[in-house]
Swiss-Prot record:
Protein source organism: Arabidopsis thaliana
Keyword Transferase attached: no
Name the UniProt record assigns to this protein: MAPK kinase substrate protein At1g80180
Residue positions, PTM Phosphoserine: 98, 105
PANTHER family referenced in this protein's UniProt entry, alphabetically: MAPK KINASE SUBSTRATE PROTEIN (PTHR33730:SF30), OS05G0542732 PROTEIN-RELATED (PTHR33730)
Organ and tissue specificity: Expressed in developing cotyledons, mature cotyledons, cotyledon epidermis and stomata.
Feature: compositional bias, Basic and acidic residues: 69-81
Tagged with keyword Phosphoprotein: yes
Functional description taken from the UniProt entry: May play a role in the regulation of stomata patterning.
Length: 138
């Protein structure tokens, strides 16, 4: 039994979804993802170098339009968090909504024997037999 070896080509795994995964395919996908991450970091490093060099170039060059006034971009109305300012929202804001509350269960007696064993409501008094009023002697 010690002489048996697993073939790297024919070995497969079956996932929880029932899809059969080939280990070779999984290895290729993980290598490709790692290479993509390395490529992205190299591109980000190059972009950062370009941006820093552009900033250095701009500081040494004179600005062509020094006499121009800046464009005023503020609107006539300022917004605070309470009237819709702040974070960008892509949904309709309807205000605060209270959480859903389950309605109380109905108090129904289905059968006589079931109502005999049921709990009494705390607000209701037990019906007692009315006794006749005591007569006063004259």
């Amino acid at each position: 039994m010690a002489g048996l070896q697993r073939s790297t080509i024919s070995f497969r795994r079956q996932g929880s979804s029932g899809i059969v995964w080939d280990d070779r395919l999984i290895a290729e996908l993980s290598q490709q993802a790692a290479n993509d991450r390395k490529g992205e970091t190299l591109q980000q490093d190059e972009q950062a170098k370009l941006i820093t060099s552009e900033v250095q170039d701009q500081t040494t060059k004179p600005i062509a339009g020094e006499g121009l006034k800046p464009i005023r971009t503020d609107g006539g109305m300022e917004r605070s968090r309470s009237n819709g300012g702040g974070a960008i929202r892509h949904h309709r804001n309807t205000g605060r909504v209270s959480p859903a509350v389950d309605p109380p269960s109905p108090r129904l007696s289905a059968f006589g024997c079931c109502s005999a064993f049921g709990k009494k409501q705390p607000g209701k008094k037990v019906n007692q037999r009315k006794r006749p009023a005591k007569r006063r002697s004259r």
